[in-house]
């Protein structure tokens, strides 16, 4: 964790470079929030074993090939009264063979718009579906951990709760090893849909997130840093870099 101006993105890039230098054969995933951030990190690292993607693209890339499980999961969610976001027209329940009895074969797709009748899911539905599938199908967790030995999340404070559950609750259930790192600042959350902080997962025990605080501010003058410290409520007290007056 680190406040504004502490060099979080620089640290993320340097960590990725060091991991790839020390482990030249492993693949690394970096999840960020915008396509602009994807492009920036790709350009700054430029390594064939690094996969940088948005949250939604990362999730879809890891579940899209499991069409049978996708259809079963969608139907289960359609029929779950607690899941209000997933409904097809006015149907109160959806039969288990809903997608199999269509005149034209249906392949579940992910696009910018939502058309569940034709098997097309959108942003929010993808998050719900992914959380359900990783919770139900443990094999998915092993597949992701076989693919990536390191997963880094940029701007974690804007990451959806469903994604944090996948990474910190479901993936650790299997024995395969994978190191997961979060870079961000709970005080800089932009979107209401983000988890904000991951305090519930912090600690020194096995499987818990160990916090590394970045207290040096490399961007702002001392007066701004002093004011920001008064406003922070998370215990991070920033210090001016040596070359800042």
Write out the residue ranges for each language-model feature.
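Accessory N-terminal region flanking or inserted into the helicase ATPase core
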Residues: 1, 11, 27, 71-155, ...
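P-loop NTPase Walker
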Residues: 1-69
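Alpha-helical scaffold elements adjacent to nucleotide-binding pockets in ATP/GTP-utilizing enzyme cores
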Residues: 15, 40-44, 54-62, 147, ...
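Active-site catalytic microenvironments for nucleophilic, acid-base chemistry
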Residues: 18-22, 44, 65, 133, ...
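Alpha-helix N-cap/helix-start capping motif
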Residues: 35, 56-57, 138, 218, ...
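Hydrophobic "anchor" residues on beta-strands that sit immediately upstream
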Residues: 50, 150-151, 180-181
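Conserved RecA-like helicase ATPase core segment
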Residues: 168-244
């Amino acid at each position: 964790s680190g406040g504004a101006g502490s060099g979080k993105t620089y640290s993320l890039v340097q960590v990725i470079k060091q991991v790839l230098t020390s482990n030249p054969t492993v693949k690394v995933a970096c999840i960020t929030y915008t396509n602009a951030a994807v492009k920036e990190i790709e350009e700054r690292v430029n390594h064939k074993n690094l996969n940088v993607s948005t949250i939604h693209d990362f999730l879809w890339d890891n579940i899209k090939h499991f069409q049978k499980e996708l259809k079963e999961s969608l139907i289960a969610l359609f029929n779950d009264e607690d899941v209000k976001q997933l409904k097809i027209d006015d149907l109160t329940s959806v039969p288990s063979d809903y997608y199999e009895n269509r005149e034209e074969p249906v392949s579940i797709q992910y696009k910018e718009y939502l058309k569940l009748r034709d098997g097309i899911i959108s942003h929010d539905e993808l998050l719900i579906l992914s959380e359900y599938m990783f919770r139900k199908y443990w094999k998915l967790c092993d597949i992701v951990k076989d693919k990536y030995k390191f997963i880094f999340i940029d701007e974690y404070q804007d990451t959806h709760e469903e994604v944090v559950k996948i990474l910190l609750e479901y993936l650790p259930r299997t024995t395969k090893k994978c190191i997961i790192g979060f870079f961000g600042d709970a005080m800089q959350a932009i979107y209401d849909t983000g988890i904000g902080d991951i305090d519930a997962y912090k600690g020194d025990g096995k499987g818990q997130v160990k916090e590394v605080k970045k207290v040096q501010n490399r961007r702002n003058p001392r007066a701004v840093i002093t004011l920001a410290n008064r406003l922070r409520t998370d215990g991070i007290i920033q210090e001016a870099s040596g070359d800042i007056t």
